[in-house]
UniProtKB/Swiss-Prot annotation:
Name of the protein in question: Transmembrane 4 L6 family member 1
Subunit organization: Present in high molecular weight complexes in tumor cells. Interacts with SDCBP2.
Topological domain spans for side Cytoplasmic: 1-9, 71-93, 183-202
Glycan-linked positions: 129, 159
Subcellular localization, as worded in the UniProt entry: Membrane
Gene Ontology annotations for the cellular component aspect, listed alphabetically: membrane
Transmembrane segments: 10-30, 50-70, 94-114, 162-182
Domain of life where this protein originates: Eukaryota
Swiss-Prot/TrEMBL keywords: Glycoprotein, Membrane, Transmembrane, Transmembrane helix
One Pfam family named in its UniProt record: L6_membrane
Family assignment from sequence similarity: Belongs to the L6 tetraspanin family.
Main localization of the protein described in the UniProt heading: membrane
Length: 202
């Protein structure tokens, strides 16, 4: 069972997704490219949870680099029974993947909550509040209500787009890390079987 190509592909993909998550999260701090809303604390509370920077970003880069570090390893030893050290290698990849699952899961949850609550925005009376907090996310299906937010301009579109990106990327990261966990378990079982086969051959 050769899994080096799969692990390498997962590692490279996670690096790309992690960078995109970090960028998306950073953009949430600057609606319309302006910094004043962050200084004045007029951003969604979930922006400050660092879901994309920490969860979908840094906690994904860790397993990604672990997987890329394994690409030079011989992961095809199951057929030739060259399995010494394989179990330790696979265990490290599983542990790294579990960290990735935790990080991506956090990213998905926070992004979903951010979408459900909606942005913090200024209404027609100049009051800042969560206009869509009590809609249970139904505002997402009715764009005609988005005009209730007067400031920042297009803040609903900004939040919906970026939180949706974080939600999608976090979901993809979760799936890839889960695949690597399954891959590592199967590789470990394969290595275990080979070690017993070696004993019988001796």
């Amino acid at each position: 069972m050769c899994s080096s190509k799969c692990t390498r592909y997962i590692g490279h993909s996670l690096v790309v997704f992690a960078v995109l998550c970090i960028v998306a999260n950073i953009l949430l701090y600057f609606p319309n490219g302006e910094t004043k809303y962050a200084y004045e604390d007029h951003l969604s509370r979930f922006v400050w949870f660092f879901a994309g920077i920490v969860g979908g970003g840094l906690l994904i880069l860790l397993p990604a680099f672990v997987f890329l570090g394994l690409e030079g390893e011989d992961c095809c030893g199951c057929w030739s029974c060259e399995n010494y050290g394989k179990r330790c290698t696979m265990l490290s990849s599983i542990m790294a993947a579990l960290i990735g699952i935790a990080g991506s899961g956090y990213c998905v949850i926070v992004a979903a909550l951010g979408l459900a609550e909606g942005p913090k925005c200024g209404d027609s009376h100049g009051m800042w509040n969560y206009t869509f907090a009590n809609t249970d996310g139904q505002y997402l299906l009715d764009p005609t209500t988005w005009s209730k937010c007067h400031e920042p301009n297009n803040i609903v579109e900004w939040n919906v787009t970026l939180f949706s990106i974080l939600l999608a990327l976090g979901g993809l990261e979760f799936i890839l890390c889960l695949i690597q966990v399954i891959n590592g378990v199967l590789e470990g079982m394969c290595s275990y079987c080979c070690s017993h086969q070696q004993q019988y051959d001796c």
